[in-house]
Structure formats: structure tokens, C-alpha cells
Amino acid sequence: MAEVSAREQIIFDLASMEWELFQLVHNTGGRASCQDDPDTFFKMRMSQWVVYSDSVLKSCMEDFQEAAAQGRNLIFEKYGRMMETTHPEEYERVRQYFPEISEQHRENVEKITAIHLEWDKKTAEAYPYLRKNGRLATTREDSADGISMESYLRGELQCFSEKTVELILKETEEAVKDGVNLQERMIENEVRFYGYESLERAEEAHRSREGEEA
């Protein structure tokens, strides 16, 4: 059996911590189906974490640990913040539990989110069938039936510390300069978890499947 590296361990530990906290989140509409699907959850979360540096991973872990020491659940806060656009009335009832964030923090979150939106457009153009199976793209598409990639990312980033968000912004902007699409990298990691050799192979499989169902 191959030895697990320190980097692989922290990625797994982050996903594990998120999963445990996710189990403590109570949805007003009842338990969500994804709360009973650890396989999909771990594949999706680890696919995201792996694109970031060790510095970001360690900073995120520190955020989770510090929040836990304060009796806070960052996953509850993440999904709670998302409700601002999907369930505004419920959001008003829970927003008091979320720490205030500075204007600079908010601006940094929006910078990262804007870049991911551009990356998402490019990914959708290159892999339309594959992208069609993901979340909605923009906040204006949010409803009680679903949350967009934009709102999900915003809600998640708002929960992390200013230090963590600054690190993520730095790496996001560096990726732009290097011509790297981190949003696409995340999806590529995910399809590999499902056995596809590449995004191209996954796209072809989804195209064929849709053709068979038509």
C-alpha cells in the first residue's frame, strides 16, 4: 500500500471535518439526500481542495479548528449564508449567528468569485454536456430549488478568515496570469475520481448518454 503524503492527509482531513460538520446541519425541509452520500461528498470536496497549495490547506484547517473552539460550525454558516438568495426569510432568522465580515474581506471574496465565473463560462463552452450536469452558474438563477456555483462559492469564502481568503485570492490571480483555469481543474479532478481519463473522455460519455436518452 502506498504511503499517504502529508498533503494527501490534510486534504482528506479537511473533507472529513467538513463531512462531520455537515452531519450537524439541520435543513428546515428535512435531511438533505447529499447528507447520506459520503462517496459523492468526498469526491467533490477533495477535487476542490487538491488545486490549492499547502499554505491554503493549512490555513483552511486552522479556520475550521478555531471555529470549532468557538463553538461555531463553518458548514452551517456556509449554507446559512447561501440562503440569502434561495430562502431569504429563513436567512433573516439565522444571519445573527454569522460573524460580521470586513469590507475588504467582502471585496476579496467578490474578486475570487468573479474570476471563477469567467472560468466557468470557458468550461461550459469547452465541455457543455459535462457542465450541464453541474450547478447553475449565476446568483440571478438562484431559487428555492437550487443554488448556483456563484452563490455557493461566495457563501463558502465568506466563512473563511481574511488570511485564508487573501491566500486563495493570491493563488487565483496567479492562476489567471499563468493561463490556468482552476474551476476546470476541479472538475477534471472530479471526473478522474469517477474513472474518466480526462475531461474530453467525460464530455464524450455525457454527450453519448444524452443522445441515448433523447
Predicted regions and their residues:
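Polar/charged low-complexity regulatory segments
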Residues: 2-36, 86-89, 96-143, 176, ...
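Basic/polar N-terminal segments that are highly enriched at the extreme N-terminus
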Residues: 1-2, 214
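Alpha-helical oligomerization segments
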Residues: 163-214
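Extended intrinsically disordered, low-complexity coil regions enriched in Ser, Thr, Gly, Ala
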Residues: 56-58, 62-80, 164, 173-188
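Short, structured interface segments
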Residues: 79-82, 86-87
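A cross-kingdom feature marking solvent-exposed beta-strand/loop segments within repeated
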Residues: 28-51, 58-63, 74-76, 141, ...
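Short, structured motif recognition centered on aromatic/hydrophobic residues
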Residues: 49-65, 109-113, 157-160, 164-172
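Short amphipathic alpha-helical segments that mediate assembly, nucleic-acid/protein binding
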Residues: 7-8, 42, 54-57, 105-108, ...
